């Protein structure tokens, strides 16, 4: 019987895995190589090998109501999008509330994780760690790998002919911390992900000129959406997810293109994606379009070659006197403490069942938590992963046969490539609500909307037409939280609380759309019923 669980890493995934273990009556021990919690979200001035690194100005791309853990809302006075220091504060409050620090061994590095000789029957692991220069071994019944995938920089220098003769400075974006020191420079940022857009926008306020080189372009989205609400609270609803799943793909793409171009015309700004029919994650940036409009940033095509001081682009244009190149080219992931056969990556495909479990193990006692990139917040995602993993360890939830898991992995990879493409940056991409529901279904935590419609129509409407946040997965099933319903119904006031810092006299108005939403939900139920019974 599984009792002792090793948790590798005390970042977001590690903290929620600790809580998942405690909730299920397991005995976790977390090994953290640094001196503190927070992982990626704990800013440090220096870059450390083996540790994720962020720049000082990083702000979350997902809002607080969509990012909090399911039974622990963020304080209502917290801003809707958090600076990294504020998010770290939330993690500290969370860890203190659930008394998680006592399970963590800091400044302890995991050297290797190996199957025990009797693994086929016991499912146990030998975990070798190093602390204070001494190596130790401990036996664990299960292992949760929570070390993240933003550690190993992807720096494809061979794809940039002439880089060896370039006389300027170049580095991966993980080395970037502040814009200070780049005054008057001509800077090229390679890439168009979130980090690339952030760094380019920030540098453009000090540099003489910033260029952004992109192979494929990208949609750019503001954090502010309809009526000033956070983008993800408008985009990630069950109703909109249902439409994206049932409407013809061409219609969905047309709707998405119209939505993305509402802020500004991407073609006019040189940003329109090369393949508009892939569901690539949009860049979240509130400054980039205005910096382009000011001329502080210029979008360029792919780099063809470099000279001592210039950059030649594929369209034949040349930019002279380039001082700095920042490669915002993403990350590869590796787990040097694991055997290569445990987490296989071949042809940009990850062989993990539901992005978590190696399918070939005789006993399902190892799970990767956080090795996923949802089109939404990572925090509720890793929480559900941890909740499912701990129940699998206990034997309450069971995995299917290896054959079934391999077939699911193959099908999932095919769908991912069809939706998101084959590029290295999309290897971990997945749809958000669909994946959350998959995991919730495994543990019995997915709400029954048909039943709720008759028992609690007000809540049912909120669940279906409102934002799909983590509270929904505490309404029923194991780990049910009595505060979940109230958290769902009061989320609007927590959104508005940090914004309403100036007292105004406003007239109260009833939610006139409530009846329309109820009727719409009834229509959906009836349509489903008639389809099910062949009417």
Swiss-Prot record:
GO molecular function: flavin adenine dinucleotide binding; monooxygenase activity; N,N-dimethylaniline monooxygenase activity; NADP binding
EC number assigned by the record: 1.14.13.-
Annotated NADP(+) binding sites: 60-61, 195-198
Entry-linked InterPro entries: FAD/NAD-bd_sf, Flavin_mOase, Flavin_mOase-like, Flavin_mOase_2, FMO-like
Cross-link (Glycyl lysine isopeptide (Lys-Gly) (interchain with G-Cter in SUMO)): 492
Record keywords, A-Z: Endoplasmic reticulum, FAD, Flavoprotein, Isopeptide bond, Magnesium, Membrane, Microsome, Monooxygenase, NADP, Oxidoreductase, Transmembrane, Transmembrane helix, Ubl conjugation
One GO cellular component term: endoplasmic reticulum membrane
Signal peptide: none
Described function: Catalyzes the oxidative metabolism of numerous xenobiotics, including mainly therapeutic drugs and insecticides that contain a soft nucleophile, most commonly nitrogen and sulfur and participates to their bioactivation.
UniProt name for this protein: Dimethylaniline monooxygenase [N-oxide-forming] 2
Species the sequence originates in: Rattus norvegicus
Gene from which the chain derives: Fmo2
